[in-house]
Amino acid sequence: MLNVSGLFVLLCGLLVSSSAQEVLAGVSSQLLNDLTQGLLRADFLPSLQTTGLQKPLSSAFDGVSGLLDIFGPPLTNEINTVSIQVKNPQLLHVSIESTPQRKEATVQVPFTSELIVQLLTMKPFTANMQSDIKVQIRLEKNVGGRYELAFGNCRLLPEAIWIQTGVQLAPAQNLLWQT
């Protein structure tokens, strides 16, 4: 009788385990789908607009002396006309990694777009950009005793943005911006 009971418990455990994995897989895919749709509904992709580089680049040249004093005004005038426009922004498949013992998870959001760089004296060129955004979320208890999601560390992975211009096989045209 003990052997039959033990076998029954073992079979029930295996059945529950496999059923739980199927349910978790379904919930996980539904959660990721809902998360992706929520990010798209947040309407942040169309809010990416033309960016002027005048202020950041001008402040970078403020303390520089020497040759830049000679070439500074023409270069600064050219910088004032630089603009970058983000086109065709897309979210790729969002993934989530959880740590149940610490009540937190990490959401990874792959992002791609085209950058159109316009200079006054040159024809505009297009660069393809790809980056992964990693956001830490955790479950916290609020003052009223209810649990809510809190967003923690948000960073780019792998601490870089890949930008490529021209032919994809030309490695000299790849740029890597470290953050």
Swiss-Prot record:
Residues 1-20 form the signal peptide. One of its GO terms (molecular function) is lipid binding. GO terms for biological process: surfactant homeostasis. Keywords: Secreted, Signal. GO terms for cellular component: extracellular region. Expressed in breast cancer and salivary gland. It comes from the Eukaryota. It is found in: Secreted. InterPro entries: BPI_fold-superfamily_member (IPR051902), Lipid-bd_serum_glycop_N (IPR017942). Major protein in sweat, has surfactant properties. PANTHER family: BPI FOLD-CONTAINING FAMILY A MEMBER 1 (PTHR47015), BPIFA4P PROTEIN-RELATED (PTHR47015:SF3). Belongs to the BPI/LBP/Plunc superfamily. Plunc family. This is Putative BPIFA4P protein. It comes from Homo sapiens (Human).
